[in-house]
Structures are given as C-alpha cells and as structure tokens.
C-alpha cells in the first residue's frame, strides 16, 4: 500500500467520550470524575485545545450525557460535539463522519481518560508524519517481565518482551484512510480495540513513537490519585 509522505493537512483531535468506565465503580462516567480542580475530561480537552497545531477538537459523547455542557471547554470555538456510539470505534467513526468529504486532515485520536498528555508528546507524534506517512501511535517499550496465564490462573510461560510495546494515545492517521478502514473492519465484525488495530487489519502498519510514562489512562480508582500527582509534577516544571 503506497503512501505519499506529507505533513500537510489540518490536525483534528478526536476524543471518544461516550463510555461509562464501569471499572471505576463510580456513579458517574469516569471522564467526569474530579481530578484536582476539574473533571478528568476537562484536563484532557485543555491539553488538546491549547496545542497550537491542533485546528479542531471533536468530542463524541453519549446521548444520555448530562455533564458535558457544564465543562468550560465545551464552549471553546475549536470544539465540536457529536453523538458517540456503543463502542469506542463507533464513536471515533461518528467523529470522522463529521469531517468534510475528501478532506486532507489528520485525525489525532486520544482517550478521554488520559489527562496527563503533554504538548511534547503531541509534537513528537506530529513530527513522525514524515517518517510514518501511514500514521503512528504513541507507545512505550515494555519494561517488566511479561507472563502468559493459563486458564486456571497460573503462569503458562514467560513472554519475550524485546519487541513488545504498550500502546498509548494519541494515535495519528490520515482521517479519510482511518474512516475507510474503521468502516470496513466494523462491517467485517472485527474486534477493534484501538485505531491502530483497524489499520493493521487493513494491512497498514503504523509507526511507534516513544511517549512519556506519565501519560496514563485512568481506569481504576488508584489511577486517579496517580494522575493527580503527575499533573502536579508537570505544573511545577512549566
């Protein structure tokens, strides 16, 4: 599959925020849980809206969402809201469908619950367009010893970590191509866990861009406290 190396085109950040985050055990969707002085999603959106290279931010929310309008970021002129779907891929596709046909934009897809993203990581991912015109993702090399579990919960084997990476977000792809491959993968019934998996299914292999360890996803209650510590540390170094 041929790609023309180009760093042109607008940058559109997409935030799928229609999920409920059941593992947090909270009464509200996890993206609206308080983190320091504001909800998690507000931190995430602020990091994207304040980046000078990002032209537009599209947030996909649930039809039942009664929290989004209370965010100050919801009124930013760079932000557009769309209705998301049941799964992450459905929400990303809804956001991509809000873009004009035949646009040359790049889609920068970022988890709603990753509030510690830095501008430096965004810069590194955007710079990778010349090296990886097919797209790339932020990721981290696996540092720990990895084990594969047997069905009874015991260790089956140790997995070589040499070529393993933790996939992070943002994930950056030409918007039209990502939309095409997401539609095709969903129509084929493929399980899509992130945008890169849809591209891989289509025979497109994204680049890996090393990201920061503090770009964590708030998934469990303990993550909330850790994210707060990371945000405070980042603020002290700015």
From Swiss-Prot:
InterPro entries: IspD, IspD/TarI, IspD/TarI_cytidylyltransf_bact, Nucleotide-diphossugar_trans. Its EC number is 2.7.7.60. Signal peptide: none annotated. Pathway: Isoprenoid biosynthesis; isopentenyl diphosphate biosynthesis via DXP pathway; isopentenyl diphosphate from 1-deoxy-D-xylulose 5-phosphate: step 2/6. SUPFAM superfamilies: Nucleotide-diphospho-sugar transferases (SSF53448). It catalyses: 2-C-methyl-D-erythritol 4-phosphate + CTP + H(+) = 4-CDP-2-C-methyl-D-erythritol + diphosphate. Pfam families: IspD. The record marks 23, 30 as: Transition state stabilizer. The record marks 161, 217 as: Positions MEP for the nucleophilic attack. GO terms for biological process: isopentenyl diphosphate biosynthetic process, methylerythritol 4-phosphate pathway. GO terms for molecular function: 2-C-methyl-D-erythritol 4-phosphate cytidylyltransferase activity. Keywords: Isoprene biosynthesis, Nucleotidyltransferase, Transferase. Catalyzes the formation of 4-diphosphocytidyl-2-C-methyl-D-erythritol from CTP and 2-C-methyl-D-erythritol 4-phosphate (MEP). Belongs to the IspD/TarI cytidylyltransferase family. IspD subfamily. This is 2-C-methyl-D-erythritol 4-phosphate cytidylyltransferase. It comes from Shewanella amazonensis (strain ATCC BAA-1098 / SB2B).
